[in-house]
Amino acid sequence: MSEEKLSGAELVVRSLEYMNISTIFGLPGGAILPAYDPLYDSPIRHILARHEQGSGHMAEGYAQATGELGVVIATSGPGATNLITPLTNALMDSTPLLAITGQVASEAIGNDAFQEAYTVGLTMAATKHNYLITSAEEIPQVLLEAKHIATTGRPGPVLVDIPKDILNQKVEWIEPKLIEMPGYKPTLEPNPKMISQAA
C-alpha cells in the first residue's frame, strides 16, 4: 500500500521536522501561504516578523546565538528581495542560514506575473548556493542538501525558491538519501603553502 500523498507545503514542514528544525522566522504572503497551513499542526515554532528583512536578521542572530541552522521563510517578489541584505550578511559572517521563498506558479515564471522576481538570479551573489524547485518530489532531498551546504565547510546562506503550484502539488513522501554531492567538497584544512606566504 502506498503512503498518503502530501502537498509540497506539507513536505516543506515535514522536511524541516525531519532535519530537527525547532524554530523558523518569517512573514506570510501569497506565494508562500500554503506552507503556513501545515505549521499549525507542527511542533516547529514560527516567529512572526513585521518585515522580511527583520525576519532574515532574526534567523541569522538565532543561528549565531544557538549554533543551529537559522531558517527564514518569505513570499515571492518583494518578500524575497527583502532577504538580500540578511543573506549577504550571513554570507560575510559565515552564518548557516536557510531561506525558503515562495515563487509565482511555474507557468508564470518569466511572464512578469504579479510579485514575480528572479529570486535565484538575484541571490546568486548573496548565497553559497540556491535552488529553484521544479517538482514537489524534490523538496525533502533539496532541503536536506541545502542544510548540508549551509552548515559544512565555511557556513553560509542557502536559498530554496518554491513556486506556488509546487507547494500545492500532491506527491508521496520520499525520505531523503545520504548527501552525495560530488561537485561540493569544502576545504576543511588550511593550505600550508598559503600560510607560509602570509607569514
Regions found by a protein language model. Give the residues of each.
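N-terminal alpha/beta PP-like core and its mobile active-site loop of ThDP/TPP-dependent enzymes
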Residues: 1-199
